């Protein structure tokens, strides 16, 4: 137990040091250029988005550290817990943003900041213990793709089609559906999907779980939150879930974080 607490303390120190140095550097730049920055509404809205992300992410990370090192939670479960924090925090940030430009810009800036930060620490011993990687460098590549995907989905759905609910639905349906596929498919997936080009590692049980979870989330977002509980909305949600599940089956492992939400969003924008 003492060793576990030592590991957590070391992790907290490493992560905390990097985070504090990054925040201090950003804060000093912010103070220096504040007279210029405060003149631009987009800059102020983007700073508000950053603030919401920090308020959301920090408590989540503090809660996940002891779960990772003080419990016997399987690695694939913890990986999905990290994913849940990532996609929910950006949806919350987006829906509370003053405009799509600020939300999309925040996603891009986070990608630019996180990638070199993870590259700096990826050779540390605690990095491999905290993050669950399928291959070397997979976490930072995945996060880079996810953040740019968030920016693109927000820009297209909200910026072009003026529909932030569709972006929220696509991101949440993908995130929850992907988690359900892993949580059901890995321990209970007995019947593998063997037709080409599926790689044979995915199961019908996991795909069914993804479809069901994605459909339920889509109904809540598109139908209840938008006040449009109609047959057309239900059909749209089911087709989004089906298209996303199919995209997940056919996509290479690391690319499903992009192909699935983009496919779901495309279906929503065409049908709604």
Indicate residue ranges for each PLM-predicted region.
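Interhelical loop and helix-boundary elements at the membrane-water interface
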Residues: 1-27, 31-54, 61-105, 114-224, ...
């Amino acid at each position: 137990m003492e060793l576990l607490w030592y590991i957590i303390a070391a992790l907290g120190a490493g992560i905390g040091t990097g985070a504090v140095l990054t925040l201090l550097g950003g804060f000093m730049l912010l103070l220096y250029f504040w007279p210029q920055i405060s003149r631009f509404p987009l800059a102020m809205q983007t700073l508000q988005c950053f603030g919401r992300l920090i308020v959301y992410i920090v408590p989540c990370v503090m809660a996940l550290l002891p779960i990772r090192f003080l419990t016997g939670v399987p690695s694939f479960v913890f990986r999905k817990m990290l994913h849940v924090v990532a996609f929910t925090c950006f949806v919350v940030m987006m829906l509370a943003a003053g405009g799509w430009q600020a939300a999309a810009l925040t996603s891009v800036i986070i990608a630019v900041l996180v990638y070199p930060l993870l590259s700096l620490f990826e050779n540390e011993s605690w990095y491999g213990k905290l993050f669950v990687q399928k291959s070397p460098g997979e976490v930072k590549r995945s996060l880079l793709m996810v953040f740019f995907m968030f920016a693109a989905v927000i820009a297209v759905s909200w910026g072009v089609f003026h529909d932030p609910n569709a972006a929220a639905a696509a991101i949440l349906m993908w995130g929850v559906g992907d988690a359900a596929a892993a949580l059901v498919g890995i321990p209970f997936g007995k019947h593998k999907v063997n037709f080409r080009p599926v790689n044979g590692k995915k199961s019908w049980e996991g795909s069914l779980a993804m479809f069901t979870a994605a459909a339920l989330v889509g109904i809540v977002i598109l139908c209840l939150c938008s006040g449009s509980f109609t047959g057309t909305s239900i059909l749209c949600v089911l087709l989004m879930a089906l298209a996303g599940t199919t995209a997940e089956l056919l996509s290479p492992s690391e690319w499903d974080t992009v192909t699935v939400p983009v496919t779901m969003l495309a279906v929503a924008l065409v049908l709604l």
